[in-house]
Amino acid sequence: GEAVGRVVALGADVNPSLLGKKVIAAITIGSLASHVVANSELCIPLPDGMTAEEGASLSTAFLTALYGLNSLANLKPGETVLIHAAAGGVGQAALQVAKRSGAKILATASTPKQAALLKQGVEQVYDSRSIDFADQVLTYTEGRGVDVVVNSLKGEWVDASFRALANGGRFIE
């Protein structure tokens, strides 16, 4: 579940700057309590201008996308990101986070969902049911590959994703 609240106590290895801050937290149980314990790695600051109610309505999909693209991948404006299963919950959240970051967005999705993703501003959409996307990404990026892969696939699709990743690129899942 999700919770919004003010940090009132910290564990031993937690950044002290979080104390007193309002955060959105992903927690497994107990979000309807007056106090909860949350992993600091699964907390993000409540954005300026966002109410607690708005923050609490964000889904785990958005927290996953924010944490993955901002905290882990450190996505920068102008970088290219490949979002697998971009029509799904985490994929849609990642698409919005990446767009807000100013990244160039490539995606995979099933054929019936590809047109909708193009309307959302995705530059290229590839078939998620074929590993041909790796070669297509390399062609589109003129052999460079993407800076970030947001992965939700398995098996040979993971290997293909690594082939589509630029030198020094980041793979998150």
Language-model regions: role of each:
Residues L165-A166:
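Helix-to-beta-strand junctions that scaffold the AdoMet/dcAdoMet cofactor pocket
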Residues G169:
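Glycine-centered, small-residue-biased loops immediately flanking beta-strands
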Residues G145-S152, I172:
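Periplasmic-binding protein-like
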Residues D132-R144:
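Short amphipathic alpha-helix with an adjacent loop that forms part of the alpha/beta core around
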Residues S59-S130:
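Mid-domain Rossmann-like dinucleotide-binding core that forms the NAD(H)/NADP(H) cofactor-binding site
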Residues E2-I29, P47-G49:
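A glycine-/small-residue-rich N-terminal strand-loop-strand element
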Residues L18, G49-T51, N74-T80, G143-R144:
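Short helix-loop-beta connector
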